[in-house]
């Protein structure tokens, strides 16, 4: 008689069970990682506009996000993001109070994950030149670790 070669059904079932357990642990971790990186990226995209806003304040111009700024206005030059709601320059709502305070607001949407869609990122400047960042209006699936350390959920 020849000796049998190969795996028994029990051995194959054990391997499938181990792979299932590993997948059950890895998939939620990956989804959290993806959401966290998307929030961090969106915060970075909005925060990158701080330099342009500072330049506008130094030049004494009104900060806008417009395709055709007037002579007294300064276009902050935002490039469209795949993570933010809206299209083009309308993705960032700019509030320039002309007293040195500025507010840049963006809402996560479009291709952002469902756990973070709808969260609002606000980067604001006080008249003393200090910039702050906060995340508000988070969806119910939001987890505290999604917010980067420099932009907490409030």
From Swiss-Prot:
Lineage: superkingdom: Bacteria
Statement: the UniProt record of this protein carries the keyword Membrane: yes
UniProt-listed GO biological process terms: cell adhesion; protein secretion by the type II secretion system
Name recorded for this polypeptide: Fimbrial protein
Main localization (coarse): other
Entries under SUPFAM superfamilies matching the protein: Pili subunits (SSF54523)
Similarity comment text for this entry: Belongs to the N-Me-Phe pilin family.
UniProt entry keywords in alphabetical sequence: Disulfide bond, Fimbrium, Membrane, Methylation, Transmembrane, Transmembrane helix
GO cellular component terms, A-Z: membrane; pilus; type II protein secretion system complex
Propeptide residue interval(s): 1-6
Segments crossing the lipid bilayer: 7-27
Membrane-related topology note: Single-pass membrane protein
PROSITE patterns given in the database record: PROKAR_NTER_METHYL (PS00409)
Localization terms from the record: Fimbrium; Membrane
Native source species: Pseudomonas aeruginosa
Disulfide bonds: 133-151
Subunit comment: The pili are polar flexible filaments of about 5.4 nanometers diameter and 2.5 micrometers average length; they consist of only a single polypeptide chain arranged in a helical configuration of five subunits per turn in the assembled pilus.
Modification type N-methylphenylalanine: residues: 7
């Amino acid at each position: 008689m020849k000796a049998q070669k190969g795996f028994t059904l029990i051995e194959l079932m054990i391997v499938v069970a181990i792979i299932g357990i590993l997948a059950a642990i890895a998939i939620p971790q990956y989804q959290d990682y993806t959401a966290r990186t998307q929030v961090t990226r969106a915060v970075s995209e909005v925060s990158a506009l701080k330099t342009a806003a500072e330049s506008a304040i130094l030049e004494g111009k009104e900060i806008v996000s417009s395709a055709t700024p007037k002579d007294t206005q300064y276009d902050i030059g935002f490039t469209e993001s795949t993570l933010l709601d809206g299209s083009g320059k309308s993705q960032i709502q700019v509030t320039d109070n002309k007293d040195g305070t500025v507010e840049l607001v963006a809402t996560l949407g479009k291709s952002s994950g469902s756990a973070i869609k709808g969260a609002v990122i606000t980067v604001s400047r006080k008249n003393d030149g200090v910039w702050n960042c906060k995340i508000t209006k988070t969806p119910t699936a939001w987890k505290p670790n999604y917010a980067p350390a420099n932009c907490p959920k409030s």
